[in-house]
UniProtKB/Swiss-Prot annotation:
Residues 56-283 form the Radical SAM core domain. Catalyzes the conversion of dethiobiotin (DTB) to biotin by the insertion of a sulfur atom into dethiobiotin via a radical-based mechanism. The gene is bioB. This is Biotin synthase. Transmembrane segments: none annotated. Pathway: Cofactor biosynthesis; biotin biosynthesis; biotin from 7,8-diaminononanoate: step 2/2. Belongs to the radical SAM superfamily. Biotin synthase family. Homodimer. GO terms for biological process: biotin biosynthetic process. [4Fe-4S] cluster binds at residues 71, 75, 78. InterPro entries: Aldolase_TIM, BATS_dom, Biotin_synth/BioAB, Biotin_synthase, Elp3/MiaA/NifB-like_rSAM, rSAM. SUPFAM superfamilies: Radical SAM enzymes (SSF102114). The lineage of its organism: Bacteria, Pseudomonadati, Pseudomonadota, Gammaproteobacteria, Oceanospirillales. Its EC number is 2.8.1.6. Binds 1 [4Fe-4S] cluster. The cluster is coordinated with 3 cysteines and an exchangeable S-adenosyl-L-methionine.
Length: 370
Protein backbone atom coordinates (compact mmCIF):
# COMPACT_ATOMS: atom_id res chain seq x y z
CA UNK A 1 0.00 0.00 0.00
CA UNK A 2 1.40 3.42 -0.92
CA UNK A 3 1.67 6.39 1.41
CA UNK A 4 -0.82 8.20 -0.80
CA UNK A 5 -3.44 5.48 -0.36
CA UNK A 6 -2.92 5.34 3.40
CA UNK A 7 -3.29 9.08 3.95
CA UNK A 8 -6.73 10.52 3.11
CA UNK A 9 -5.25 14.02 3.03
CA UNK A 10 -2.07 13.20 1.12
CA UNK A 11 -0.90 15.72 -1.46
CA UNK A 12 2.35 16.23 -3.31
CA UNK A 13 5.32 17.09 -1.09
CA UNK A 14 6.76 19.66 -3.48
CA UNK A 15 7.78 23.19 -2.35
CA UNK A 16 4.56 24.51 -3.90
CA UNK A 17 2.42 22.27 -1.68
CA UNK A 18 -0.57 24.09 -0.18
CA UNK A 19 -2.90 22.37 2.29
CA UNK A 20 -6.62 22.54 1.72
CA UNK A 21 -8.83 24.45 4.16
CA UNK A 22 -11.79 22.24 4.97
CA UNK A 23 -14.67 22.15 7.43
CA UNK A 24 -16.18 18.86 6.27
CA UNK A 25 -13.68 16.28 7.53
CA UNK A 26 -15.43 13.00 8.29
CA UNK A 27 -14.72 11.14 11.51
CA UNK A 28 -13.32 8.27 9.47
CA UNK A 29 -10.87 10.57 7.66
CA UNK A 30 -9.64 12.02 10.94
CA UNK A 31 -9.24 8.57 12.48
CA UNK A 32 -7.24 7.55 9.41
CA UNK A 33 -4.84 10.42 10.05
CA UNK A 34 -4.40 9.29 13.65
CA UNK A 35 -3.63 5.78 12.36
CA UNK A 36 -0.84 6.84 9.99
CA UNK A 37 2.71 5.66 10.70
CA UNK A 38 4.17 8.16 13.17
CA UNK A 39 6.86 9.49 10.82
CA UNK A 40 4.39 9.90 7.95
CA UNK A 41 2.01 11.82 10.20
CA UNK A 42 4.67 14.21 11.49
CA UNK A 43 6.05 14.76 7.99
CA UNK A 44 2.61 15.67 6.73
CA UNK A 45 1.99 17.98 9.71
CA UNK A 46 5.33 19.72 9.20
CA UNK A 47 4.49 20.27 5.52
CA UNK A 48 1.25 21.97 6.50
CA UNK A 49 2.97 24.00 9.19
CA UNK A 50 5.64 25.36 6.85
CA UNK A 51 3.03 26.33 4.27
CA UNK A 52 1.58 28.94 6.65
CA UNK A 53 4.06 29.74 9.43
CA UNK A 54 7.68 30.43 10.17
CA UNK A 55 8.54 26.89 11.34
CA UNK A 56 10.82 28.16 14.12
CA UNK A 57 8.55 30.87 15.53
CA UNK A 58 6.42 30.25 18.62
CA UNK A 59 3.70 32.63 19.80
CA UNK A 60 4.36 33.47 23.46
CA UNK A 61 1.66 34.43 25.96
CA UNK A 62 1.37 35.14 29.67
CA UNK A 63 -1.63 33.95 31.67
CA UNK A 64 -2.94 35.57 34.84
CA UNK A 65 -5.76 34.22 37.00
CA UNK A 66 -7.78 37.34 37.80
CA UNK A 67 -10.32 35.44 39.91
CA UNK A 68 -9.46 32.05 41.40
CA UNK A 69 -11.53 29.25 42.93
CA UNK A 70 -15.14 28.51 43.93
CA UNK A 71 -16.36 28.02 40.35
CA UNK A 72 -19.93 26.61 40.36
CA UNK A 73 -19.21 24.28 37.42
CA UNK A 74 -18.41 20.61 38.09
CA UNK A 75 -15.69 19.99 35.47
CA UNK A 76 -14.04 16.84 36.82
CA UNK A 77 -10.53 17.91 35.82
CA UNK A 78 -10.56 21.37 37.35
CA UNK A 79 -9.05 22.35 40.72
CA UNK A 80 -11.03 25.61 40.62
CA UNK A 81 -14.39 23.84 40.84
CA UNK A 82 -16.23 24.49 44.09
CA UNK A 83 -17.48 20.90 43.97
CA UNK A 84 -14.11 19.42 44.95
CA UNK A 85 -11.70 19.86 47.84
CA UNK A 86 -8.37 20.60 46.18
CA UNK A 87 -7.02 23.00 48.79
CA UNK A 88 -7.47 25.95 46.46
CA UNK A 89 -8.90 28.95 48.27
CA UNK A 90 -11.46 31.36 46.89
CA UNK A 91 -10.07 34.72 45.83
CA UNK A 92 -11.82 37.92 44.83
CA UNK A 93 -11.45 39.54 41.44
CA UNK A 94 -8.04 41.20 41.24
CA UNK A 95 -7.83 44.96 41.30
CA UNK A 96 -7.30 46.57 37.92
CA UNK A 97 -3.98 48.15 38.88
CA UNK A 98 -2.58 44.77 39.95
CA UNK A 99 -3.58 43.28 36.62
CA UNK A 100 -1.96 46.15 34.71
CA UNK A 101 1.20 45.75 36.78
CA UNK A 102 1.42 42.08 35.83
CA UNK A 103 0.72 42.90 32.19
CA UNK A 104 3.63 45.34 32.16
CA UNK A 105 5.89 42.66 33.65
CA UNK A 106 4.68 40.16 31.06
CA UNK A 107 5.50 42.53 28.22
CA UNK A 108 8.95 43.16 29.71
CA UNK A 109 9.45 39.39 29.85
CA UNK A 110 8.82 39.07 26.12
CA UNK A 111 5.15 38.09 25.94
CA UNK A 112 3.12 39.41 23.02
CA UNK A 113 -0.28 38.41 24.41
CA UNK A 114 -1.74 38.73 27.91
CA UNK A 115 -4.45 36.26 28.86
CA UNK A 116 -6.77 36.74 31.83
CA UNK A 117 -8.84 33.94 33.32
CA UNK A 118 -11.69 34.03 35.84
CA UNK A 119 -13.34 31.04 37.53
CA UNK A 120 -16.93 31.94 36.68
CA UNK A 121 -19.88 30.24 35.05
CA UNK A 122 -20.60 33.56 33.38
CA UNK A 123 -19.55 37.13 34.26
CA UNK A 124 -21.97 39.22 36.31
CA UNK A 125 -22.76 42.77 35.25
CA UNK A 126 -20.60 44.40 37.92
CA UNK A 127 -17.70 42.11 37.05
CA UNK A 128 -18.09 42.73 33.32
CA UNK A 129 -17.66 46.46 33.89
CA UNK A 130 -14.37 45.79 35.65
CA UNK A 131 -12.96 43.31 33.13
CA UNK A 132 -13.78 45.54 30.17
CA UNK A 133 -11.71 48.27 31.81
CA UNK A 134 -8.93 45.72 32.36
CA UNK A 135 -8.96 44.94 28.66
CA UNK A 136 -8.61 48.58 27.70
CA UNK A 137 -5.77 49.18 30.14
CA UNK A 138 -3.82 46.09 29.05
CA UNK A 139 -4.45 46.83 25.39
CA UNK A 140 -2.99 50.30 25.89
CA UNK A 141 0.33 48.68 26.81
CA UNK A 142 0.63 47.30 23.29
CA UNK A 143 -0.25 43.72 24.16
CA UNK A 144 -2.77 41.46 22.49
CA UNK A 145 -5.52 40.55 24.95
CA UNK A 146 -7.36 37.31 25.66
CA UNK A 147 -9.91 36.37 28.32
CA UNK A 148 -11.67 33.26 29.54
CA UNK A 149 -14.65 34.15 31.73
CA UNK A 150 -17.05 31.26 31.17
CA UNK A 151 -20.17 31.54 29.05
CA UNK A 152 -21.01 34.88 27.44
CA UNK A 153 -24.14 35.97 25.62
CA UNK A 154 -24.17 38.15 22.51
CA UNK A 155 -24.36 41.42 24.43
CA UNK A 156 -21.51 40.48 26.78
CA UNK A 157 -19.37 39.39 23.84
CA UNK A 158 -20.02 42.67 22.03
CA UNK A 159 -19.06 44.69 25.09
CA UNK A 160 -15.81 42.77 25.44
CA UNK A 161 -15.08 43.31 21.75
CA UNK A 162 -15.83 47.03 22.03
CA UNK A 163 -13.39 47.22 24.95
CA UNK A 164 -10.70 45.90 22.61
CA UNK A 165 -10.53 42.21 23.52
CA UNK A 166 -8.73 40.34 20.75
CA UNK A 167 -9.30 36.68 21.73
CA UNK A 168 -11.87 34.85 23.80
CA UNK A 169 -11.05 31.37 25.10
CA UNK A 170 -13.79 28.79 25.57
CA UNK A 171 -12.74 25.17 25.18
CA UNK A 172 -14.96 22.32 24.00
CA UNK A 173 -12.94 20.02 26.30
CA UNK A 174 -13.79 16.67 24.68
CA UNK A 175 -16.11 14.96 22.21
CA UNK A 176 -19.90 15.42 22.35
CA UNK A 177 -20.33 11.74 23.28
CA UNK A 178 -17.85 11.78 26.17
CA UNK A 179 -18.71 15.26 27.41
CA UNK A 180 -21.37 14.10 29.89
CA UNK A 181 -18.73 12.00 31.68
CA UNK A 182 -16.73 15.15 32.42
CA UNK A 183 -19.21 17.99 32.96
CA UNK A 184 -22.90 18.11 33.87
CA UNK A 185 -23.44 21.78 34.77
CA UNK A 186 -23.32 23.11 31.20
CA UNK A 187 -24.06 21.47 27.89
CA UNK A 188 -22.00 21.06 24.75
CA UNK A 189 -24.54 23.27 23.02
CA UNK A 190 -23.87 25.97 25.64
CA UNK A 191 -20.21 25.93 24.71
CA UNK A 192 -20.89 26.11 20.99
CA UNK A 193 -23.31 28.98 21.57
CA UNK A 194 -20.67 30.97 23.45
CA UNK A 195 -18.21 30.44 20.59
CA UNK A 196 -20.85 31.62 18.11
CA UNK A 197 -21.49 34.73 20.23
CA UNK A 198 -17.77 35.49 20.36
CA UNK A 199 -17.44 35.16 16.60
CA UNK A 200 -20.54 37.29 15.97
CA UNK A 201 -19.03 40.03 18.13
CA UNK A 202 -15.97 40.09 15.90
CA UNK A 203 -13.42 38.60 18.29
CA UNK A 204 -10.95 35.85 17.50
CA UNK A 205 -11.70 32.41 18.91
CA UNK A 206 -9.41 30.36 21.13
CA UNK A 207 -10.87 26.87 21.59
CA UNK A 208 -9.45 23.39 22.05
CA UNK A 209 -9.69 20.51 24.45
CA UNK A 210 -8.12 18.26 27.06
CA UNK A 211 -6.69 14.83 26.30
CA UNK A 212 -6.00 12.02 28.73
CA UNK A 213 -9.29 12.15 30.67
CA UNK A 214 -10.11 8.51 29.97
CA UNK A 215 -11.63 9.19 26.57
CA UNK A 216 -11.45 6.69 23.72
CA UNK A 217 -9.33 7.37 20.62
CA UNK A 218 -12.52 8.06 18.67
CA UNK A 219 -13.38 10.83 21.13
CA UNK A 220 -10.12 12.61 20.32
CA UNK A 221 -10.96 12.48 16.63
CA UNK A 222 -14.51 13.69 17.34
CA UNK A 223 -13.24 16.63 19.41
CA UNK A 224 -11.04 17.78 16.53
CA UNK A 225 -13.94 17.27 14.12
CA UNK A 226 -16.06 19.67 16.19
CA UNK A 227 -13.29 22.29 16.11
CA UNK A 228 -12.83 21.87 12.36
CA UNK A 229 -16.55 22.41 11.79
CA UNK A 230 -16.28 25.91 13.25
CA UNK A 231 -16.24 28.37 10.36
CA UNK A 232 -13.77 29.96 10.36
CA UNK A 233 -11.46 27.64 12.27
CA UNK A 234 -10.41 28.92 15.72
CA UNK A 235 -7.42 31.21 15.43
CA UNK A 236 -5.90 29.51 18.46
CA UNK A 237 -6.33 25.81 19.33
CA UNK A 238 -4.99 24.81 22.77
CA UNK A 239 -4.32 21.08 23.06
CA UNK A 240 -4.05 20.24 26.75
CA UNK A 241 -2.79 17.08 28.39
CA UNK A 242 -4.67 16.41 31.62
CA UNK A 243 -2.90 17.66 34.74
CA UNK A 244 -4.06 15.30 37.48
CA UNK A 245 -4.87 17.41 40.55
CA UNK A 246 -5.41 15.69 43.93
CA UNK A 247 -8.99 16.14 45.10
CA UNK A 248 -10.52 16.11 41.63
CA UNK A 249 -12.29 13.02 40.23
CA UNK A 250 -9.53 12.79 37.61
CA UNK A 251 -6.61 12.50 40.02
CA UNK A 252 -6.12 8.75 39.43
CA UNK A 253 -6.87 8.48 35.72
CA UNK A 254 -4.37 6.46 33.69
CA UNK A 255 -1.50 8.45 32.18
CA UNK A 256 -1.67 9.24 28.50
CA UNK A 257 1.09 7.97 26.20
CA UNK A 258 3.11 11.06 25.15
CA UNK A 259 3.31 9.83 21.55
CA UNK A 260 -0.48 9.60 21.41
CA UNK A 261 -0.57 13.22 22.52
CA UNK A 262 1.93 14.18 19.79
CA UNK A 263 -0.30 12.48 17.22
CA UNK A 264 -3.17 14.73 18.33
CA UNK A 265 -1.01 17.83 17.89
CA UNK A 266 -0.07 16.70 14.38
CA UNK A 267 -3.65 15.91 13.37
CA UNK A 268 -4.83 19.28 14.71
CA UNK A 269 -2.17 21.00 12.61
CA UNK A 270 -3.25 19.14 9.46
CA UNK A 271 -6.94 19.83 10.01
CA UNK A 272 -6.53 23.53 10.87
CA UNK A 273 -3.60 24.74 8.75
CA UNK A 274 -3.80 28.44 9.59
CA UNK A 275 -4.56 28.13 13.32
CA UNK A 276 -1.99 28.53 16.05
CA UNK A 277 -1.87 25.14 17.79
CA UNK A 278 -1.01 25.71 21.43
CA UNK A 279 0.99 23.24 23.47
CA UNK A 280 -0.92 23.92 26.64
CA UNK A 281 -1.51 22.34 30.06
CA UNK A 282 0.57 19.28 30.88
CA UNK A 283 3.78 20.61 29.39
CA UNK A 284 5.48 20.54 32.79
CA UNK A 285 5.21 16.75 32.76
CA UNK A 286 6.83 16.50 29.31
CA UNK A 287 10.55 16.06 28.84
CA UNK A 288 12.42 18.15 26.31
CA UNK A 289 12.25 15.46 23.64
CA UNK A 290 8.46 15.27 23.86
CA UNK A 291 8.16 19.04 23.65
CA UNK A 292 10.51 19.09 20.66
CA UNK A 293 8.30 16.52 18.92
CA UNK A 294 5.27 18.68 19.65
CA UNK A 295 6.89 21.65 17.92
CA UNK A 296 7.86 19.41 15.01
CA UNK A 297 4.25 18.20 14.84
CA UNK A 298 3.05 21.78 14.39
CA UNK A 299 2.59 23.29 17.85
CA UNK A 300 3.51 26.97 17.63
CA UNK A 301 2.05 28.64 20.70
CA UNK A 302 2.79 28.29 24.41
CA UNK A 303 2.40 29.94 27.80
CA UNK A 304 5.76 31.11 29.06
CA UNK A 305 6.64 30.82 32.71
CA UNK A 306 5.90 29.42 36.10
CA UNK A 307 2.17 28.81 36.43
CA UNK A 308 -0.77 28.06 34.13
CA UNK A 309 -3.75 29.23 36.19
CA UNK A 310 -3.59 26.74 39.10
CA UNK A 311 -1.38 24.03 37.60
CA UNK A 312 2.37 23.96 37.11
CA UNK A 313 4.30 25.27 34.13
CA UNK A 314 8.04 25.01 33.39
CA UNK A 315 10.37 27.64 34.78
CA UNK A 316 11.21 30.59 32.57
CA UNK A 317 14.88 29.67 32.39
CA UNK A 318 14.11 26.11 31.28
CA UNK A 319 11.78 27.38 28.58
CA UNK A 320 14.36 29.80 27.29
CA UNK A 321 17.05 27.11 27.33
CA UNK A 322 14.79 24.79 25.33
CA UNK A 323 14.13 27.53 22.78
CA UNK A 324 17.89 27.99 22.43
CA UNK A 325 18.49 24.24 21.99
CA UNK A 326 15.82 23.95 19.31
CA UNK A 327 16.61 27.21 17.53
CA UNK A 328 13.14 28.59 18.26
CA UNK A 329 12.24 32.23 18.77
CA UNK A 330 9.16 34.12 19.98
CA UNK A 331 6.74 35.15 17.26
CA UNK A 332 6.28 38.94 17.19
CA UNK A 333 2.79 40.38 17.59
CA UNK A 334 2.90 40.95 13.86
CA UNK A 335 4.17 37.63 12.44
CA UNK A 336 5.63 39.57 9.49
CA UNK A 337 7.55 42.02 11.64
CA UNK A 338 11.28 42.50 11.13
CA UNK A 339 13.28 39.54 12.41
CA UNK A 340 15.59 41.92 14.23
CA UNK A 341 12.98 42.35 16.95
CA UNK A 342 13.46 38.73 17.94
CA UNK A 343 16.99 39.32 19.15
CA UNK A 344 16.56 42.75 20.64
CA UNK A 345 19.22 43.16 23.31
CA UNK A 346 17.13 45.44 25.48
CA UNK A 347 14.36 42.83 25.62
CA UNK A 348 16.89 40.27 26.83
CA UNK A 349 17.98 42.57 29.65
CA UNK A 350 14.37 43.35 30.56
CA UNK A 351 13.54 39.66 30.63
CA UNK A 352 16.34 38.90 33.08
CA UNK A 353 15.18 41.66 35.41
CA UNK A 354 11.53 40.63 35.10
CA UNK A 355 12.32 37.02 36.01
CA UNK A 356 14.15 38.15 39.14
CA UNK A 357 11.31 40.45 40.21
CA UNK A 358 8.65 37.81 39.69
CA UNK A 359 10.24 34.80 41.39
CA UNK A 360 8.23 35.23 44.57
CA UNK A 361 5.16 36.90 43.07
CA UNK A 362 2.22 34.54 43.43
CA UNK A 363 0.11 36.68 41.12
CA UNK A 364 2.34 36.29 38.07
CA UNK A 365 1.62 33.58 35.54
CA UNK A 366 4.31 33.71 32.86
CA UNK A 367 3.84 32.27 29.43
CA UNK A 368 5.57 29.88 27.10
CA UNK A 369 3.06 27.14 27.35
CA UNK A 370 -0.28 26.58 26.37
Amino acid sequence: MTAQSRDPAWTDASPTFQPTMRHDWSLEEIEALFALPFNDLLFRAQQVHRAHFDPNAVQVSTLLSIKTGACPEDCKYCPQSGHYNTGLGKEKLLEIEKVVEQARAAKAAGASRFCMGAAWRSPREKDLRVVTEMVGRVKALGLETCMTLGMVDVDQARRLAEAGLDYYNHNLDTSPDYYGEIITTRTYADRLETLANVREAGMKVCSGGILGMGEAPRDRAALLQQLVRLDPHPESVPINMLVKVPGTPMENVEDMDPLTFIRAIAVARILMPKSHVRLSAGREQMDESTQALAFLAGANSIFYGDTLLTTGNPQVERDRALFDKLGLHPEPSDPHADDAHRDDEQAEIALAHAIQRQRDDALFYDATRG
